[in-house]
């Protein structure tokens, strides 16, 4: 029964992938539904499209630096940018202050998230837009979201426009504290590891095993991390 179920599911997925591509994919441009409201991000998340689909997504949000997405699309958009190593584009979107951004609401003095990021609407209670916040400790500090473990692997990223960051998370109830500061192309990366945790850092393709207590690493950024 298990194999039959798997075969059926695979067949359904193949059918719908083909149907969605036929209905929405523009073979001339490489985009789905003209890329409106993060359509290309949804396609990439489903394993659809080609290299142009990613290129179009990056180009659009590099220029606009604003969200035209709903709360699900906002999450998927940021997720896909990060999944394809477009950290700077994602960071620019999340830190923007133009109309249609989180910073725009903050600039207006709002303390909650509107239903539409670019239009003042009757509903000012859409906290689900804030789901993208989960990427901040994971990406900026490298803290994994798997908390019930004593094996912790840090994979930090360093956005071009961010000079420093700090934060912590608990693993098996024990803290890992991270803080870093950037000077030119050099990162001073400090980590406190609680007793009983095995922690390592992966950066620039190199793995460094940390010891309990205070650790400090000097990381040289690669050229493509500052472009």
Residue ranges: model-predicted function:
Residues 11, 15-18, 88-227:
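Non-catalytic C-terminal accessory modules of carbohydrate-active enzymes
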Residues 1-123, 211, 218-221:
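Catalytic cores of carbohydrate-active enzymes
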């Amino acid at each position: 029964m298990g194999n039959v179920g798997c075969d059926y599911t695979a067949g359904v997925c193949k059918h719908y992938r083909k149907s969605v591509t036929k209905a929405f994919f523009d073979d001339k441009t490489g985009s789905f539904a003209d890329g409106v409201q993060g359509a290309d991000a949804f396609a990439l998340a489903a394993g659809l499209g080609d290299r142009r689909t990613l290129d179009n997504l990056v180009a659009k949000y590099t220029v606009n630096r604003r969200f035209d997405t709903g709360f699900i699309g906002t999450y998927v958009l940021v997720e896909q940018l990060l999944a394809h190593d477009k950290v700077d584009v994602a960071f620019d979107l999340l830190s923007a202050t133009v109309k249609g951004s989180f910073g725009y609401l903050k600039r207006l003095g709002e303390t909650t998230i509107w239903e539409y990021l670019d239009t003042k609407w009757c509903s000012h209670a859409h906290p689900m837009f804030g789901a993208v916040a989960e990427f901040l400790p994971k990406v900026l500090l490298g803290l994994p979201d798997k908390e019930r473990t004593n094996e912790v692997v840090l994979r930090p990223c360093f956005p071009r426009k961010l000079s420093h960051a700090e934060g912590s998370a608990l693993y098996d109830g024990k803290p890992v504290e991270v803080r870093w500061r950037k000077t030119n192309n050099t990162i001073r990366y400090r980590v406190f590891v609680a007793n009983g945790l095995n922690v390592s850092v992966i950066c620039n393709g190199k793995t460094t095993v940390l010891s309990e207590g205070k650790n400090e690493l000097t990381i040289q950024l690669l050229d493509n991390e500052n472009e």
